[in-house]
């Protein structure tokens, strides 16, 4: 048996998330469907670095699975792409050691969140950015406030209340804002992220940018470890899983 690591990109618009759900269209289900065809209807279990929610995108999601097929990796990639729907693309296939694990070998992740600040939003970007109705935030204030998030903290304040995870300590190594034309990008890296953590951070820092929350308030929110003290969860379509580090 060979263990293959694959990196995929997907448009999350028409998926009910990454993880298999009965009766729903998901990224994992589509990949396992195609692998079953390639393996003569034998089920192949795929493991991802983590799940993404409905309408969330990925440009660098990483998976692994075991296969007995002796197909060269480049041909494996082409075979998958021929049969996968057009909103999923396999970017690379690599044979790895058997102790590699797409989830447990992760050392860090990078996410990107995008707001469209155009006076009139481009309709072709509506599924891939969050429309601000022309509002342009104070990015200098947002960047200053972000400094309170960088570092190792208990991030309970930026975690969905319904999570079952007990240990909420994570390390955010970088959090930057960048203008790309009329789009504002938030790029965040860390050793791991809690459920909805990036979207809650985005929603909270956005409030700083539009003067609904002070720069100093963010440090208080982090120290509170209280979800109710943070802002709203930002919409899913602006979020991208950009890269997984090993």
UniProtKB/Swiss-Prot annotation:
It catalyses: uridine(38/39/40) in tRNA = pseudouridine(38/39/40) in tRNA. This is tRNA pseudouridine synthase A. Pfam families: PseudoU_synth_1. Substrate binds at residue 111. Keywords: Isomerase, tRNA processing. One of its GO terms (biological process) is tRNA pseudouridine synthesis. Belongs to the tRNA pseudouridine synthase TruA family. The active site is at residue 53. InterPro entries: PsdUridine_synth_cat_dom_sf, PsdUridine_synth_TruA, PsdUridine_synth_TruA_a/b_dom, PsdUridine_synth_TruA_C, TruA/RsuA/RluB/E/F_N. It comes from Lysinibacillus sphaericus (strain C3-41). It is an enzyme of class 5 (isomerase). One of its GO terms (molecular function) is RNA binding. Homodimer. Formation of pseudouridine at positions 38, 39 and 40 in the anticodon stem and loop of transfer RNAs. Its EC number is 5.4.99.12.
